[in-house]
Amino acid sequence: MNRLPSSASALACSAHALNLIEKRTLDHEEMKALNREVIEYFKEHVNPGFLEYRKSVTAGGDYGAVEWQAGGLNTLVDTQGQEFIDCLGGFGIFNVGHRNPVVVSAVQNQLAKQPLHSQELLDPLRAMLAKTLAALTPGKLKYSFFCNSGTESVEAALKLAKAYQSPRGKFTFIATSGAFHGKSLGALSATAKSTFRKPFMPLLPGFRHVPFGNIEAMRTALSECKKTGDDVAAVILEPIQGEGGVILPPPGYLTAVRKLCDEFGALMILDEVQTGMGRTGKMFACEHENVQPDILCLAKALGGGVMPIGATIATEEVFSVLFDNPFLHTTTFGGNPLACAAALATINVLLEQNLPAQAEQKGDMLLDGFRQLAREYPDLVQEARGKGMLMAIEFVDNEIGYNFASEMFRQRVLVAGTLNNAKTIRIEPPLTLTIEQCEQVIKAARKALAAIRVSVEEA
């Protein structure tokens, strides 16, 4: 039987939610009730699969499934009031920490003026953010399209490349094995994970994948496409593969890809949704090799962990295909005043506090600690790797990776796996993590591995 709409039920549910939003703390009974509600509503109205996916953080009790609020700049608090060091960073959105006061203040001030733009008048913050990004990004990148997510920024990049290269008879895209560029139809065509791709086949035609980090494979693909008349419009890749398991290419790889793109007349699209905004020790990961892309994709940390925003920044030559008709690719909420306020404040914090340099320093400290643990536990840990504050610990099998996330949760440190590599646990904390918290994370990892070794030996 079809369920009839119920205005009364919707009104009661929304009123209950507003009451919770107003509260700073919950008593014990309220906490238990909220946990039950959240789990039930996820099961019945969001997606029950998420409950299974988050089993590593529910191993210590279902209270762990319910996030309540930010703690300090680098911590989260659950409904029991227990504080966790955040080494997941919302998959890379909290580069300047949780509720960074500069970012929150900028958004609150803009909220008091005008939350969203009229769509007809020129909005000043969009202009100022575009100018700021033109100054901040490498090379000749000049014009920005704003959206709401990393996937959307990749979609815009693909469409820009198509619009620019189609008159030149170039329609093929080359992406890399292990890549993750999002899950909308265009971005998914560039993503290289069968689990995400197969249910939506056929995807967009014209996409080829080559091994990441293998410059000869890239050259061969570009050459073969040219020989067969399937000339390449663009090469799209991540400077470091995040969801692929924090995979670093060989030194000089990005430089070599840039040269190949120039040689074959292909555009270079760099997806820095996860590696950008100071994460790897530079403002953008491509700066480690002084590589200048034709199109750059940003999102995640651009909004300072307060507002969602993505950006696609391109050279004037490429972006000019939208000059005659700027409505060829638009989005209602892209570049809205609240999101732009957050992004401008985020950039200001990153530069004022020199957080990219801090990411390099603290990342080296953490990675040294994880590599020492890999030497102490070779039966469990295959490798520790990373750059800046984007790190990964790869285990000998999937089960140990899951157990490590669970044990770290018991040690009050939040970590999680990567989407394309189940054996790998990602370490992606805020760049504002303190030295003391870095030391706590390493101690927690040592305790977690010791507990896992005992359980393996007893099994």
Swiss-Prot record:
The protein's required cofactors: pyridoxal 5'-phosphate
InterPro entries (UniProt xref): Aminotrans_3 (IPR005814), Aminotrans_3_PPA_site (IPR049704), Class-III_PLP-dep_AT (IPR050103), Putrescine_aminotransferase (IPR017747), PyrdxlP-dep_Trfase (IPR015424), PyrdxlP-dep_Trfase_major (IPR015421), PyrdxlP-dep_Trfase_small (IPR015422)
Pathway in which the depicted protein is active: Amine and polyamine degradation; putrescine degradation; 4-aminobutanal from putrescine (transaminase route): step 1/1
One annotated GO biological process: L-lysine catabolic process
Bridged cysteine pairs (disulfide): none
Reaction(s) this enzyme catalyzes, per UniProt: an alkane-alpha,omega-diamine + 2-oxoglutarate = an omega-aminoaldehyde + L-glutamate; putrescine + 2-oxoglutarate = 1-pyrroline + L-glutamate + H2O; cadaverine + 2-oxoglutarate = 5-aminopentanal + L-glutamate
Residue sites binding pyridoxal 5'-phosphate per the record: 150-151, 274, 332
SUPFAM superfamilies hit by this protein: PLP-dependent transferases
Any GO MF annotation of the entry: identical protein binding
EC number: 2.6.1.82, 2.6.1.29
Alphabetical keyword list: Aminotransferase, Pyridoxal phosphate, Transferase
Keyword Transferase: yes
The keyword Acyltransferase is assigned to this record: no
Enzyme class, first EC level, given as a word: transferase
Pfam family, one: Aminotran_3
Transmembrane segment boundaries: none
Modification sites for N6-(pyridoxal phosphate)lysine: 300
Similarity field: Belongs to the class-III pyridoxal-phosphate-dependent aminotransferase family. Putrescine aminotransferase subfamily.
Function as written in the Swiss-Prot or TrEMBL entry: Catalyzes the aminotransferase reaction from putrescine to 2-oxoglutarate, leading to glutamate and 4-aminobutanal, which spontaneously cyclizes to form 1-pyrroline. This is the first step in one of two pathways for putrescine degradation, where putrescine is converted into 4-aminobutanoate (gamma-aminobutyrate or GABA) via 4-aminobutanal. Also functions as a cadaverine transaminase in a a L-lysine degradation pathway to succinate that proceeds via cadaverine, glutarate and L-2-hydroxyglutarate.
Descriptive protein name: Putrescine aminotransferase
Species of origin: Escherichia coli (strain SMS-3-5 / SECEC)
Name of the gene encoding the protein in the UniProt record: patA
